[in-house]
Regions:
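Structured, acidic catalytic/metal-binding patches in enzyme active sites
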Residues: 1-165
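A cross-kingdom marker for long, charged
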Residues: 155-156, 160-189
Length: 189
């Protein structure tokens, strides 16, 4: 399917040797013996590795912070404003077919995800505790490797997206966020 490398190559064949050497112990530790993942595109292999590693280390990726934020907002009679950017893809089947067969520049996403897992899993707990008590200085000091932006960029910079006119996603995301901030301030201050 969509996750497999279009040319049938395996991660060992497409990753630089030093990056592949870093992947192997993380894959064995968190994903286990499942060898199918080695035939996936780096972006998809990285995403699964990251999700499984977080889960196995006791981190929840959904439903932890947001319910508390919503509860506090309701208690304070504040309306939550969520910035969103919608991307409508014309002829989605054609786009998926193109994406499936197109090369992706996803090594940076993969490398940053590996780096984050190697250096940041233990710090995530420290950062979560700092966030919980509002220790902004410690949060700034413990800024994580930003693998998410690199991985989002892979998809948004893919030729299939560029051909469909989605070239301005960072600006659209920033505009949506600023508009949501302005709406929230106007409504809640």
């Amino acid at each position: 399917g969509l996750r497999k490398n279009p040319d049938g190559k395996r991660l060992q064949e497409i990753l630089p040797p030093e990056l592949y050497a870093r992947w192997v112990p993380l894959k064995e530790r968190y994903v286990g013996k499942d060898d199918d993942i080695n035939g996936w595109r780096p972006i998809f292999a990285a995403a699964v590795l990251y999700e499984v590693a977080l889960r196995k280390r006791g981190f929840e990726t959904t439903g932890v912070i947001w319910p508390t934020v919503e509860k506090l907002a309701r208690k304070s009679k504040l309306e939550v404003t969520e910035p969103t950017v919608s991307v409508k893809v014309e002829k989605p089947r054609d786009a998926i077919k193109e994406f499936k067969n197109a090369p992706l520049d996803d090594l940076d996403c993969f490398a940053k995800t590996i780096e984050r897992l190697e250096s940041d899993l233990d710090l995530m707990r420290v950062r979560a505790n700092a966030w919980a008590v509002g220790d902004v200085a410690q949060l700034r000091q413990l800024a994580p490797v930003d693998n998410a932006s690199a991985c989002i960029a892979v998809v948004m910079n893919a030729q299939v997206m560029q051909d469909r006119g989605y070239t301005d996603w960072p600006a659209r995301r920033a505009e949506a966020w600023l508009a949501a901030v302005e709406q929230a301030l106007a409504r809640n201050v």
